[in-house]
């Protein structure tokens, strides 16, 4: 026989510290927690093997291909500061292992089997470097930031949104009424909640019709372009596209999808439809915390954000840094830049393990949403800058005078913050003062300031470096 059968150590084949990474390799950084007694090199090599060409033994068909051409390689291992049992393993994958334009296939390979691997106590994918050669096989976001601004004719400020609440139980007509009030008051967008699909109390077609009516009415009264994220997420891809087609026929500007529960295949199909038909696509990340919240196991959200930019979406929820949901500031800003910018430098202080070059793939607007209200406006304006969507659900609808005044309060607060920033004032230091000044001539804002002056969601973030 030309080979020796039996179980052999992965590190003999898959640990190659002298390997020079290629410009076309997909690079991954894994946080590896090996079982006691498993050396880090063996664990890192095992990850490289099991997520590429390896299996647990030598097989005779290995001789029919060139392992050197196709194998993943663990090319560097470093300890994690402050964690004795954890290591960062860097793995390089040859580009030929992946189908072009398929996020689904990329994830099936890189995070498919290997996460259940016995020799590892835990495994987390911290970051991916997508090479330009692979990026170029994706359409990416249907439109991107600049095209969206041109479609909406809104420049020089963040966009304002609001999720309609109560999220489940309203009839379509009452739902449309709530949409109209918010848009008339000064918001740019309203949003279907992620779990509003087509339930017995409100079927999707009724909702689409009433929301569109609300949108056109608000548009004609305010002279501004308005949008409502019509959630097209459905149980089958065919049904999802049917809903998107109906939205296009109604002439609305934007639809929405839950990309993790819907899946990357469905999401990419919808993104292609949206580009072909001039619809913007808002992406909600329902289920992300199942995957990304544990510090030592799962996939970090920055990887899910990169995957979404490849699969396609014009907006994606990305934490607030200040509200009720998870998000450490530097880490959040790291993946916000990954979503918006063309070229992002490696920066370990922001959790960025690799330099990412998107080669002019359109950008995605980060959406800050979850437990935010008018007092957060200066911080949000400073942290996220102009290219973002700030979404106040309860922070609009919870206004004591109703939805429209709640919308007015948010719009006034935003315009005041943008003006103050443009005049050179420091929003971080003078934020409260700016909001107070503005509330003197806006009774709606004054009422909002009063009701939310004490609300805080202060817990330590789990997602620290």
Curated annotation (Swiss-Prot):
Domain of life assignment: Eukaryota
CDD domains tied to this protein: RuBisCO_large_I
PTM annotation, UniProt: The disulfide bond which can form in the large chain dimeric partners within the hexadecamer appears to be associated with oxidative stress and protein turnover.
GO molecular function, one term: ribulose-bisphosphate carboxylase activity
Catalytic activity: 2 (2R)-3-phosphoglycerate + 2 H(+) = D-ribulose 1,5-bisphosphate + CO2 + H2O; D-ribulose 1,5-bisphosphate + O2 = 2-phosphoglycolate + (2R)-3-phosphoglycerate + 2 H(+)
Annotated residues for binding of Mg(2+): 191, 193-194
Chief place where the protein resides: plastid
Sites bearing N6-carboxylysine, chain numbering: 191
Keyword field contains Glycoprotein: no
Family recorded in the similarity comment: Belongs to the RuBisCO large chain family. Type I subfamily.
Complex and partners: Heterohexadecamer of 8 large chains and 8 small chains; disulfide-linked. The disulfide link is formed within the large subunit homodimers.
Name assigned to this protein: Ribulose bisphosphate carboxylase large chain
Source organism (scientific name): Cornus oblonga
Lineage: Eukaryota, Viridiplantae, Streptophyta, Embryophyta, Tracheophyta
């Amino acid at each position: 026989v030309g080979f020796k059968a039996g179980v052999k150590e992965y590190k003999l084949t898959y640990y190659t510290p002298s390997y020079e990474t290629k410009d076309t390799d997909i690079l991954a950084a894994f946080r590896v927690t090996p079982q006691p007694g498993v050396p880090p090199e063996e664990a890192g090599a095992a990850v490289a093997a099991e997520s590429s060409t390896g299996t647990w033994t030598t097989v005779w068909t290995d001789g029919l291909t060139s392992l050197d051409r196709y194998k993943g390689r663990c090319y560097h291992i470093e300890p994690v500061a402050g964690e004795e049992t954890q290591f960062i393993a860097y793995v390089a994958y040859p580009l030929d292992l992946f189908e072009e334009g398929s996020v689904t296939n990329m994830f099936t390979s890189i995070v498919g089997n290997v996460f259940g691997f016995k020799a590892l106590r835990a495994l987390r994918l911290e970051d991916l470097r997508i090479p330009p050669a692979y990026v170029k096989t994706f359409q990416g976001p249907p439109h991107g930031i600049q095209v969206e601004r041109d479609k909406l004719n809104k420049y020089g400020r963040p966009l304002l949104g609001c999720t309609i609440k109560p999220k489940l139980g309203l009839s379509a007509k009452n739902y449309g009424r709530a949409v109209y009030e918010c848009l008339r008051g000064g918001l740019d967008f309203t949003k279907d909640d992620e779990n509003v699909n087509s339930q017995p109390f409100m079927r999707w077609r009724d909702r689409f019709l009433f929301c569109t009516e609300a949108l056109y009415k608000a548009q004609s009264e305010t002279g501004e372009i308005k949008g409502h994220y019509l959630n097209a997420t459905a149980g089958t891809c065919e049904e999802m596209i049917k809903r998107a087609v109906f939205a296009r026929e109604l002439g609305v500007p934007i639809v929405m999808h839950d990309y993790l529960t819907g899946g990357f295949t469905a999401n990419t199909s919808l993104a292609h439809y949206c580009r072909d038909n001039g619809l913007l696509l808002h992406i909600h990340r329902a289920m992300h915390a199942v995957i990304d919240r544990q510090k030592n196991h799962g996939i970090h959200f920055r990887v899910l954000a990169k995957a979404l930019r490849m699969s396609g979406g014009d907006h994606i929820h990305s934490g607030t840094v200040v509200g009720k949901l998870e998000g450490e500031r530097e880490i959040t800003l790291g993946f916000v830049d990954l979503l918006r910018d063309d070229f992002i430098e490696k920066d370990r202080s922001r959790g960025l393990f690799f330099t990412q070059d998107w080669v002019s793939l359109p950008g995605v607007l980060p959406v800050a949403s979850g437990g935010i209200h008018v007092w957060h406006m200066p911080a949000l304006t400073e942290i996220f800058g102009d290219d973002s969507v700030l979404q106040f659900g309860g922070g609009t609808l919870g206004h004591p005078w109703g939805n429209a005044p709640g919308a007015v309060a948010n719009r006034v607060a935003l315009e005041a913050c943008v003006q103050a920033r443009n005049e050179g004032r420091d929003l971080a230091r003078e934020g409260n003062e700016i909001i107070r000044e503005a509330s003197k001539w806006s009774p709606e804002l004054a009422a909002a300031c009063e009701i939310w002056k004490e609300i805080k969601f202060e817990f330590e973030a789990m997602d620290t470096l």
